[in-house]
Amino acid sequence: MAPVHPSVSRSRCLIVALVSTDSVPSARDRFARLKALAPAIFALSVVLRVASTMGYYLVEGDAFFDLRIYVLGGAALNNPGTLYEFFYTDPLKNEQLPFTYPPFAAILFYPLHLLPFGLTALLWQLALVGAVYATVRLSQRFVGGGSRRIAMLWTAVAIWMEPPGGSIQVGQIGIFLMLAVLYAAYSTRWWVSGLLIGVTAGIKLTPAITGLYFVGVRRWGTALFSAVVFFATVGIGYLLLPDETRRYFPGRMSEAGHDLPVGSVWNQSWRGGLSRIVGHDVGTGALLIGALLVTALISVLAWRALGSVGGARDRLASLLVIQIFGLVASPVAWTHHWVWVVPLMIWLFHGPWRAKPGARLLGCVWFALMVLSVPTLLSSAQSSIHDISQPWYLAWAGLVYIVAAVATLVWMIVAGRRADYPDGSAADGPGLGRPPVTAHRRGTEDAPEQDDPDRGDGQR
């Protein structure tokens, strides 16, 4: 067999289920054929994903419950004072799910109730699939480029992974918010970036942590404008829904996670993980504060490491550090909130540090965790999502995403100490030996793309 091209080795985790390893042609030829079939694979995957989710919804009814809440939240505006009073009851689990978003989000969700719910659900999940593809493409631009066919293959697999697949099944808005935050970090226009972060934070508070990214890269105007836009969304809510806005800020906002099953294995935050280990909700006690302080220190060191190679800063990885910290620090980080793993894997396999020792292994670990849906497997041993106490081995296994996230940050610190690359590829791709796409040039969006992603994933 001909020698395996390095990029094929980097992509093996992605194509292991699609390409036989014992055929006569070289691995590179197999990968080329796979790439040629990318549109068909992508189309088939999307059809199966949409059909399976819609079929589950039609048969069981236990799907799109987050989307149900968005629709009901928008419709509640027709009955003033009911936005934070209603509950959607899950038909299978009999859980009562309230509307937990700011009033501004309900205003944006208002048009959703004007269509039949089945049609809304179909269009919503198609849009989510499109957002996953756009996320992959934008992540490729961060690392220097990449072909549309590779993006199709990534998307075809990603929509079946736990975070994106779970988001599609429940109709979560998180993928849309991730795409908006990614573009905010990619854009060099302060008003575009600030507008996107302010609006997304107005819809769901968690994207507000991205302000730390803009402060860290000294984009002061963007950080300030994002705060102005956020408060503008609060003002819009107050003008249109004064009672609901007064009720949400600061009351319901400060109660985030208070009535939620924080000890469920689906909650992959430090609060959830530590609660399962000790057998009760740790709340905001010393144990949680200690874990967050240690993680914050590790995140700061990882941030510094990402700016230490050649004096340049890896923008995508720096953004990922902030988002990873935000996930583990949140009171509740359901598995479908971890959609940021998709750009993380793209960075590990195709980014400027891809030749660093451990990058491919770490990417494969994340890939395996996402495909195996470890929390889903562990949930089968969970009698109720409200039961916190569980056997020690299940409690420790339930730290899986948290441990992988902290390990990723630690790896960034260790890898950042190496200014050279063991295979001599310091000038082999975008960001290696030169600024890693620190500021994109105008017009590069329309630059011809590399047909062969095996060369630095499309250098510019």
Q: Where does each model-flagged region fall?
A:
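Acidic, Ala/Val/Gly-enriched low-complexity intrinsically disordered segments
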Residues: A2-V4, V8, V16-V19, V437, ...
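Intrinsically disordered, low-complexity polar segments enriched in Ser/Thr/Pro and acidic
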Residues: P3-S7, M178, A185, P430, ...
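Primarily membrane-embedded glycan-assembly and transfer machineries that use lipid-linked glycans
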Residues: I15-S193, V217-T335, I388, Y393-A397, ...
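Aromatic-enriched
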Residues: T53, F349-H440, E449-D452, D457-R460
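Hydrophobic/basic alpha-helical segments enriched in Actinobacteria
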Residues: L138-S147, S187, I203, W220, ...
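Transmembrane helices and adjacent periplasmic/lumenal helix-loop junctions
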Residues: I197-F214, S330-W340
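Alpha-helical transmembrane segments in multipass membrane proteins, preferentially the mid-helix core
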Residues: L301-A302, V339-P352
